[in-house]
């Protein structure tokens, strides 16, 4: 029975897809195949298609099968980081003279990749408010090969109607790439809504424990999958076996973790909306969020990420970050522990002076799975 027919239920797929019992010992958890090369049965006689671990490794294969099943795709590819996955994708899709549309609130690392690296390839790019399909359409050119979307976006929690933007992109002959890092496949499945490629930083919710760095691409198009696999092997920025094992462990509990992240975040967002020092709360679960209806349509729940703006400007926002005690001041997101950061000085510093620059008074929360009362109390004392 193939993985996609184990069950239609996400929680069951997360535990069983790609997790075949070890044929030698019966171990229910796939081993960490910490190996670089494989014995051949005669010249070219490969066992299971394995010859060199840059090309393929059984532990990585298990993870890639798991990721494909969870996103409803036919091919998953695991990389050494989310940016390594982005780099492979861009090298596969684009050449000199091509054009890409990216969000006007993209992740700082993605912006840096386009601004400092991709532009040197002779590739053109422009920004658009992807929450507005007409703005995406206006940004298209005859050379556009891809439209890039984050939803929810990092760090402004913007929401893009995936199905609507997919239609706009496809009408122009472009592919739609969706960064699904904030939502995860448990909350949102972009391929089912018309996306061509789903991107993940596995470092975040998929790993879920702040102990691994990784990235992934998932597609349904077999030809595109083969092209990506060729570039993955040619470039070599693959996920190692132990990293693959850590993420595979993480995906098993993804559903229960995301339920708790979302539950805690909803309560925290509600508290922040009523706090006198908070001027704005950015969380798609709030009815007043401009993307709430779209998010409710395409997401199972609203996730664990919140951003908010603080009265008093940049220094006040920094002070809130520094005063937190249960929330750890640090970059990244998606672990079981709650994190707080100042995007303008930390994760999104590379956007300063650009169209993607984030507000100086912005604070970003990655809400963990601790007792929510402790988190609420910590934020209240940090805000003063």
Regions found by a protein language model. Give the residues of each.
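Conserved small-domain helix->loop->beta segment predominantly found in fold-type I
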Residues: 266-325, 329-331, 350-354
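Conserved N-terminal alpha-helix of the aminotransferase class I/II PLP-enzyme fold
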Residues: 37-87, 109-116
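Positively charged, small/polar-rich N-terminal and surface patches that mediate targeting and assembly
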Residues: 2-7, 11, 58, 270, ...
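Conserved PLP-enzyme active-site core in the AAT-like
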Residues: 2-6, 16, 75-277, 282
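Short, well-ordered beta-strand elements within core beta-sheets of diverse protein domains
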Residues: 247-256, 303-311, 364-368
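A common structural junction motif
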Residues: 235-236, 323-332, 382-384
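N-terminal "arm"/small-domain region of PLP-dependent enzymes with the aminotransferase-like
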Residues: 2-57, 63-66
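PLP-dependent enzyme catalytic core of the Aspartate aminotransferase-like
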Residues: 115, 124, 145, 322, ...
């Amino acid at each position: 029975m193939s993985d996609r027919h184990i069950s239609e239920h996400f929680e069951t797929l997360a535990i069983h897809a790609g997790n075949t019992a070890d044929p030698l010992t019966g171990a229910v958890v796939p081993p960490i195949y910490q190996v670089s090369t494989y014995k051949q049965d005669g010249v070219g006689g490969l066992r299971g298609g394995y010859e060199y671990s840059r090309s393929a490794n059984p532990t990585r294969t298990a993870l890639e099968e798991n990721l494909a099943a969870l996103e409803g795709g036919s091919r998953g590819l695991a990389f050494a980081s989310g940016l390594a996955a982005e780099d492979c994708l861009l090298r596969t899709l684009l050449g000199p003279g091509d054009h890409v549309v990216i969000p006007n609130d993209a992740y700082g690392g993605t912006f840096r990749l386009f601004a400092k690296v991709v532009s040197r390839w002779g590739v053109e790019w422009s920004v658009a408010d992807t929450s507005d399909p007409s703005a995406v359409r206006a940004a298209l050119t005859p050379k556009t090969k891809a439209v890039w979307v984050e939803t929810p976006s990092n760090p402004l929690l913007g929401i893009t109607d995936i199905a609507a933007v997919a239609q706009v992109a496809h009408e122009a002959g472009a592919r739609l790439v969706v960064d699904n890092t904030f939502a995860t496949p448990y909350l949102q499945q972009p391929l089912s809504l018309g996306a061509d490629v789903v991107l993940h930083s596995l470092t975040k919710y998929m790993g879920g424990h702040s102990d691994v760095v990784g990235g992934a691409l998932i597609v349904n198009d077999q030809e595109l999958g083969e092209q990506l696999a060729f570039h993955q092997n040619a470039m070599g920025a693959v996920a190692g076996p132990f990293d693959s094992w850590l993420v595979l462990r993480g995906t098993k509990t993804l559903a229960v973790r995301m339920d708790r992240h979302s539950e805690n975040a909803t309560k925290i967002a509600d508290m922040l909306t009523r706090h006198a020092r908070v001027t704005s709360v950015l969380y798609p679960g709030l009815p007043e969020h401009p993307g709430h209806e779209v998010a409710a349509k395409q997401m199972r729940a609203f996730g664990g990420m919140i951003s908010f703006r603080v009265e008093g400007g940049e220094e006040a926002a920094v002070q809130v970050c520094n005063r937190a005690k249960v929330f750890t001041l640090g970059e990244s997101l998606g672990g079981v522990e709650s994190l707080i950061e100042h995007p303008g000085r930390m994760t999104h510093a590379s956007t300063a002076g650009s169209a993607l620059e984030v507000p100086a008074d912005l604070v970003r929360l990655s809400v963990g799975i601790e007792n929510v009362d402790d988190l609420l109390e910590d934020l209240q004392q940090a805000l003063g």
